[in-house]
Amino acid sequence: MTKEKIVLAYSGGLDTSVAIQWLVESGYEVIACCLDVGEGKNLDFIKEKAITVGASASYTIDAKEEFAENFALIALQAHAYYEGKYPLISALSRPLIAKKLVEVARQEGASAIAHGCTGKGNDQVRFEVAIHALAPDLKVVSPVRDWKWSREEEINYAKEHNIPVPIDLDNPFSIDQNLWGRSNECGVLENPWTTPPEAAYDLTVSLEDAPDTADIVEITFDAGIPISLNGENMSLANLILTLNEIAGKHGVGRIDHIENRLVGIKSREVYECPAAVTLITAHKELEDLTFVREVAHFKPIIEQKISETIYNGLWFSPLTEALIAFLKSTQKFVNGTIRVKLFKGHAIVEGRKSPNSLYDENLATYTSSDTFDQDAAVGFIKLFGLPTKVSAEVNSKVTITTEV
């Protein structure tokens, strides 16, 4: 009898390694699938481990460029910070992982997909909603959520089935990383009063250890896309990874956040996103230079909504598609170069230039070269202030009594 095929989102860690054996015992033929989205995974090791543990096939996919160009770029152009702080690190990679899982499932003729998420996090929602959007006929299985084992029970199960137990299990933190940043939770971070220890960080240095000399970087954008760093053209993925190193050594991009999860609880998260913070800061300044006022004032409304829909796992929803369409329509003239000073945790814009700049020095100056028609201000003020004046004239005739 042919076994039912299931594609597992495989990380190489304890949870998903145990999940392979658990799914095999449940009657499935397991196909493992692992993506590198910029966290620097050893894909060859992970591919071999999946087979050793019990998978019948193992896919490893270098998805850094696709992640950068189709997912991180949207977050950059949307200046996406969930609740004004979280730059959607993990939330951005989940729809891409789900997309690849569905592609492998179709290729293998699988009828189900499995993930290693717990029952109290956001990722279970992101994976399952994305999979249902892309392949509503596929069943989704969540071993970790179903078995409800403690960490000790999981380790014992692994030992009983000769599953290699990772040597870093004593690490108190739960970490997720991609090229857009690094997320950290659990351990001492669960107490919101506790200062995050330096051991919680990897991409950035503390302000105390940051250099006393700044780095100056120039980032060039073409239609809202970063295309070069300090005059050197590079792919978006490489530009982000390079900027992570440069900005990270100055302590840029540390975020400590009490976050409202989709599942209804608050969690304390520590993030590192040096490139994301630097790029969003630079991109925002270039938009300020090239946007007309009405677009500049309206776009933040769209930015907030995009941040929420992505965080909530609705990447493939009609709403997100429409929001992204608006976003892309605004980027045509976002061309130019931004000069940023990286120093002691700050990304400070010190210069900007653009062939599409709407800044006219002759209109803005107060020198003799001023070309602004100040006489036009009289009529403008009269018309602009007319509703306020009429309201005051009408309502001043009404006696207002205020009771104390």
From Swiss-Prot:
<dbReference type="GO" id="GO:0000050">
    <property type="term" value="P:urea cycle"/>
</dbReference>
<feature type="binding site">
    <location>
        <position position="259"/>
    </location>
    <ligand>
        <name>L-citrulline</name>
    </ligand>
</feature>
<dbReference type="GO" id="GO:0006526">
    <property type="term" value="P:L-arginine biosynthetic process"/>
</dbReference>
<keyword id="KW-0055">Arginine biosynthesis</keyword>
<dbReference type="GO" id="GO:0004055">
    <property type="term" value="F:argininosuccinate synthase activity"/>
</dbReference>
<dbReference type="Pfam" id="PF20979">
    <property type="entry name" value="Arginosuc_syn_C"/>
</dbReference>
<comment type="subunit">
    <text>Homotetramer.</text>
</comment>
<dbReference type="InterPro" id="IPR048267">
    <property type="entry name" value="Arginosuc_syn_N"/>
</dbReference>
<dbReference type="Pfam" id="PF00764">
    <property type="entry name" value="Arginosuc_synth"/>
</dbReference>
<feature type="binding site">
    <location>
        <position position="86"/>
    </location>
    <ligand>
        <name>L-citrulline</name>
    </ligand>
</feature>
<dbReference type="GO" id="GO:0005524">
    <property type="term" value="F:ATP binding"/>
</dbReference>
<dbReference type="GO" id="GO:0005737">
    <property type="term" value="C:cytoplasm"/>
</dbReference>
<feature type="binding site">
    <location>
        <position position="118"/>
    </location>
    <ligand>
        <name>L-aspartate</name>
    </ligand>
</feature>
<comment type="similarity">
    <text>Belongs to the argininosuccinate synthase family. Type 1 subfamily.</text>
</comment>
<feature type="binding site">
    <location>
        <position position="123"/>
    </location>
    <ligand>
        <name>L-aspartate</name>
    </ligand>
</feature>
<protein>
    <recommendedName>
        <fullName>Argininosuccinate synthase</fullName>
        <ecNumber>6.3.4.5</ecNumber>
    </recommendedName>
</protein>
<dbReference type="InterPro" id="IPR001518">
    <property type="entry name" value="Arginosuc_synth"/>
</dbReference>
<feature type="binding site">
    <location>
        <position position="122"/>
    </location>
    <ligand>
        <name>L-aspartate</name>
    </ligand>
</feature>
<keyword id="KW-0067">ATP-binding</keyword>
<keyword id="KW-0547">Nucleotide-binding</keyword>
<dbReference type="InterPro" id="IPR018223">
    <property type="entry name" value="Arginosuc_synth_CS"/>
</dbReference>
<feature type="binding site">
    <location>
        <position position="174"/>
    </location>
    <ligand>
        <name>L-citrulline</name>
    </ligand>
</feature>
<dbReference type="InterPro" id="IPR024074">
    <property type="entry name" value="AS_cat/multimer_dom_body"/>
</dbReference>
<keyword id="KW-0436">Ligase</keyword>
<feature type="binding site">
    <location>
        <position position="126"/>
    </location>
    <ligand>
        <name>L-citrulline</name>
    </ligand>
</feature>
<keyword id="KW-0963">Cytoplasm</keyword>
<comment type="pathway">
    <text>Amino-acid biosynthesis; L-arginine biosynthesis; L-arginine from L-ornithine and carbamoyl phosphate: step 2/3.</text>
</comment>
<feature type="binding site">
    <location>
        <begin position="9"/>
        <end position="17"/>
    </location>
    <ligand>
        <name>ATP</name>
    </ligand>
</feature>
<dbReference type="InterPro" id="IPR014729">
    <property type="entry name" value="Rossmann-like_a/b/a_fold"/>
</dbReference>
<keyword id="KW-0028">Amino-acid biosynthesis</keyword>
<dbReference type="InterPro" id="IPR023434">
    <property type="entry name" value="Arginosuc_synth_type_1_subfam"/>
</dbReference>
<feature type="binding site">
    <location>
        <position position="183"/>
    </location>
    <ligand>
        <name>L-citrulline</name>
    </ligand>
</feature>
<feature type="binding site">
    <location>
        <position position="116"/>
    </location>
    <ligand>
        <name>ATP</name>
    </ligand>
</feature>
<dbReference type="GO" id="GO:0000053">
    <property type="term" value="P:argininosuccinate metabolic process"/>
</dbReference>
<feature type="binding site">
    <location>
        <position position="122"/>
    </location>
    <ligand>
        <name>L-citrulline</name>
    </ligand>
</feature>
<dbReference type="InterPro" id="IPR048268">
    <property type="entry name" value="Arginosuc_syn_C"/>
</dbReference>
<feature type="binding site">
    <location>
        <position position="271"/>
    </location>
    <ligand>
        <name>L-citrulline</name>
    </ligand>
</feature>
